[in-house]
């Protein structure tokens, strides 16, 4: 009879513990699939069993070809319970509070100790039943064995998996904290290519280490001509909660199907739940026919002849960009919006921060009270500075923003911006990253800065380490933000760390 099972090695059986992940044998001549665990009692070699036997016919009635197909047996084992599954059907649940050994096993719990894995095939015997020679030869085929261990610390740059063992696919994202749980939203990226194949993914966690997959919360549309039809590009999703309306509001950068990065739109969707589904509302450029608050009357009056500035990067071109040439160019249709983030201030006001003017200038725009549109109030910061990937946070009344330069998928030196008023004057400070590989942001690009709940002084810098040859294989970099004696934030590489 075939079995996939585990045994401990620190004591004799059964006090060492036994877990039968997959076992097949006959009970009173009837084939069964078993899911068991055994541990010790006060009697030597006397076992206490928690056993569930499911008749084989339970599976073959659903599918007569069941025996000829591969199936997945799975064990989820944590500090509280052992759960045994067959093709995602729970066969047995064994609470560890019940699995304490008797006196022979010194009242210890064998399932808090390591177990080793066995795969075997026994033939005949009491449990296997008589051997039917006519049925031989037979095959016991195993396609793979995989073991995943939940992380107890954040390890940047490695493959991160969710609680089901699947690779987390949430790139360019951000995290929302709501009612005791963190929700991580990000781009579902394909194995090859750059267009969106599924939509926006969501994962949830209570400890920032173990993430449950909540699904695609904003899928692409099957409707031909929809702004978010298959073939569009959905990037940098961020979600905020509106306390007044009770709605969860998602904004993201959208490029229309077949248009490359020309449309440069801001898109918005809304939901009654953090895990969706989100209803797509609209996409458009930002604040059409409205000038920025910090653009002078003189700059507004300038009439630009774009043909005179076709050659970029000249002193004359830089001067024109700083004075708002591209703002004027895009005035009627609205300002471009690419890499973006959202920020909710202490007074509940929300802001949309995005790369605009062909990625040359950052803009900060105030959102309406329901967070679903713009009020028309916005500013430009660092015209011609070539900033993208904004990630903003606030500490002790000071606003901080980490951005990157524009070098495509390749990493570059991060920038640190600061202000005392979000729609006020911003100034730039040196690279916040320190140490080895700091000039490349440790191989990543900023996407979000997450404030830890329960403290106003701890933040996590979130970045993506892009792999354009297979964007689905891009990695995550999460590092603690620290502050020097002057209160200026800095980021240093840490191999393994745990949020407090």
Per-segment meaning from a language model:
Residues 1-152, 357, 375-384:
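GH16 jelly-roll
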Residues 7, 17, 34-44, 151-234, ...:
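Beta-rich carbohydrate-recognition and catalytic domains
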Residues 56-60, 235, 326:
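Short structured motifs
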Residues 67-88, 94, 391-404, 415-418, ...:
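Short, conserved beta-strand/loop elements in beta-sheet-dominated catalytic cores
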Residues 98-151, 441-500:
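Feature marks hydrolase-like catalytic cores characterized by long aromatic- and Gly/Pro-rich stretches
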